[in-house]
Amino acid sequence: MKDHQKIILVGDGAVGSSYAFACVNLSIGQEFGIIDIDKDRTIGDAMDLSHAVPFSTPKKIYSANYSDCHDADLVVVTAGTAQKPGETRLDLVNRNIKIMKGIVDEVMASGFDGIFLIASNPVDILTYATWKFSGLPKERVIGSGTSLDTARFRMSIADYLKVDARNVHGYILGEHGDTEFPAWSHTTVGGLPITEWISEDEQGAMDTIFVSVRDAAYEIINKKGATFYGVAAALARITKAILNNENAILPLSVYLDGHYGMNDIYIGAPAVVNRQGVRHIVEMNLNDKEKEQMKNSADTLKKVLDDAMKQID
């Protein structure tokens, strides 16, 4: 593992700048370049972020060009059209897949041979597209997937039970979007199954918890226009796991090749990640209902993906 850790961020909007700030605060990486169509904004953000460095650890932060990607360990993409009130993430695909192709072509032209981390929506489809456009191994193209959804899930359960969210373990699987679902059969609190904390009489509470998680982004968008702090924190966590070679298990958008009975698709599932990217996909033993939900989520993504890729071919 080389000592110098270099990150290039493509997309300096609300998510991108929040991610950059999180990396500064959490002392992630030693070099951080920022690319955006608005060059002045990247210059201003690099200056502003640099002034936070004395409160953290040394880091070089600058306005970058695509040529700077050539020796980056990680290229993180948050660029794209934002989700509007009333829009689903899948509604964004036609606009954002063309933007993504342009970005990936520029990055690869630099000689980049690191790891892509995609956060632009719809993230599962754009991660698949990035893999196709880049020609990189599937292990080195990763999407943020259901990492934020899972954090919301754990927090909501913790709030309901009045426990620390760090003692809640469970995953949201599938699409980062409307067809996602909770793997209740593998959700534990303090080592005990969730069913030992929430009785059958409280089934409605479990349903309410999930709906609040699934629809959280819509509520935030309606109230403040966009979500960015949560996903920025999720990206920072993934970045740390990769650069520090943690072999951490995180719920990401990863390529399934027979896992969960799925093939040729990027979708949210737990995976072991380290400096080489995805080391291993954790295949949970889902119950029949969850298997059907996973299939439904994959089928929904496949249909949109096939239509979107035809635009580019």
Swiss-Prot record:
Activity regulation note: Allosterically activated by fructose 1,6-bisphosphate (FBP).
Gene Ontology CC annotations of this record: cytoplasm
Taxonomy, superkingdom: Bacteria
Record-level GO BP terms: glycolytic process; lactate metabolic process; pyruvate metabolic process
Catalytic activity of the protein: (S)-lactate + NAD(+) = pyruvate + NADH + H(+)
GO molecular function: L-lactate dehydrogenase activity
Positions of the catalytic residues: H176
Pathway info: Fermentation; pyruvate fermentation to lactate; (S)-lactate from pyruvate: step 1/1
Annotated NAD(+) binding sites: V15, D36, R41, Y66, A119, S120, N121, S144
Phosphotyrosine: modified positions: Y218
Amino acids binding substrate: Q83, R89, N121, P122, V123, D124, D149, T150, A151, R152, T227
Localization per record: Cytoplasm
Subunit structure: Homotetramer.
Described purpose of this protein according to its UniProt entry: Catalyzes the conversion of lactate to pyruvate.
Record's protein name: L-lactate dehydrogenase 1
Natural source organism: Listeria monocytogenes serovar 1/2a (strain ATCC BAA-679 / EGD-e)
Gene giving rise to this polypeptide: ldh1
